[in-house]
Amino acid sequence: MLAPAIPLFDPEASPGEVHLRRATINDLDALVELENASFAVERMSARQWRRHLESLSAEIFVAIRERRVIGAAVLFFRRSHRVARLYSIAVAAGERGRGIGEILLGAVEQSARRRGCRVLRLEVRADNPAAQRLYERKGYRRFGLRPGYYEDGEDALRYEKALIAAVA
């Protein structure tokens, strides 16, 4: 059974509310700005963002508050593959701790389920305990380590979550 639909952008909603929608090419500058503010290393360039926005094997969600992108999540798929990958999730510094990451995570999980994926996997920096707590709270389990995975030598912790319950 699929999760309830994630509400997408609602122009009638109250000011200050967070809206979620799929990103478009019109979000390119805001995505690059969020990326540069959120990550010290391994930032995606405008060219990479454009390629992902145009790709059939990627889906990008943005969280919007008062017409401003305050969060984004990038999900990758492979044809006829039942495992999706959360490539990136970022929330603006002033918006962290307000549930934006959880909203974005719910959207990518729902999208992966709709595409028939059974598992969602991700890597997270070993020095990012806040993100690790979010993933663990949402049912992800750690299943591996990639030493020196990031450009600056930091390790990556590998997490995954079953999206479709096992049938007995």
Predicted regions and their residues:
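Well-formed, non-transmembrane alpha-helical positions, independent of function
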Residues: 30, 133-134
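Glycine-rich phosphate-binding loop
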Residues: 99
